[in-house]
Design a protein with these regions (language model features):
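N-terminal accessory/interface modules of nucleic-acid-binding and processing proteins
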Residues: 1-228
């Protein structure tokens, strides 16, 4: 029985207090090495081929926003995870973890002071998916009409989006950095239009306006961002 679902981190901290300082440090060091080994292993697996990358991007789309290392860590433990929070965070929301639920390893950022300076660190804690919580489970969102999606995509765009009839063959849309404009072919299917504009908006967001922009350099990130 995992008592952390009833007692949170308190029992773990009390257990740690029974270890010597050296034993506790060694235990935590081993824990961190195992966690980062899991993250590195999953990252290498994800980028092996297109299918494995697609699976990870699908996971990113279903999972509530997380830092990248947590995404790899959670994906390695259960690709069905949708929304995770620590025991304490669920408790703050008045939610209860289901009996028998096993927590997932989870990286939690935290601040600490060293030599009078605030530093950024992290700890390894247990987190629980919403499927493990006694609450009404979220329903899958109904697909929105394409017109509504397109309007949301184009609203408040930081770059101009303009129809162009002279794009090269097989080019659906293209971001031109020195003009801060996305040129898009008219008359494509709804899906092709939406995804091509999404991709070029992602390219534009990766342009730092310092002359370093390279289409080849941002393509992979842009395609992934647009897919998600």
């Amino acid at each position: 029985m995992d008592l952390t679902k009833f007692l949170g981190q308190d029992s773990q901290e009390q257990s740690a207090q029974r270890l010597s300082k050296e034993e506790y440090a060694a235990q935590k060091k081993q824990e961190r090495e195992e966690i980062w080994g899991m993250i590195d292993g999953k990252a290498q697996e994800v980028f092996q081929n297109g299918d494995s990358l697609k699976g990870f991007l699908d996971f990113m789309g279903q999972c509530k926003p997380q830092r990248t290392d947590n995404l790899f860590l959670l994906y390695a433990q259960n690709p069905e995870i949708r929304q995770v929070k620590t025991f304490e965070k669920w408790k703050e929301e008045g939610k209860v973890v289901k009996t028998g639920s096993k927590g997932y390893n989870f990286i939690v950022g935290q601040e600490y002071e060293k030599d009078g300076v605030i530093q950024q660190g992290y700890s390894i804690q247990k987190a629980y998916d919403i499927s493990q919580i006694r609450t009404k489970q979220p329903e899958e969102a109904e697909p929105k009409p394409m017109d509504q999606l397109m309007e949301a995509l184009l609203t408040d765009s930081e770059v101009r989006i303009q129809i162009a009839d002279n794009l090269p063959d097989k080019v659906q849309a293209q971001y031109i950095p020195n003009k801060r404009t996305i040129y898009v072919r008219n008359g494509m299917s709804e899906n092709a239009t939406f995804h091509s504009i999404s991709r070029e908006l992602a390219c534009a967001s990766l342009d730092h306006h310092d002359g370093s922009y390279s289409r080849a350099g941002v393509s992979a990130q842009a395609y992934c961002a647009a897919y998600v």
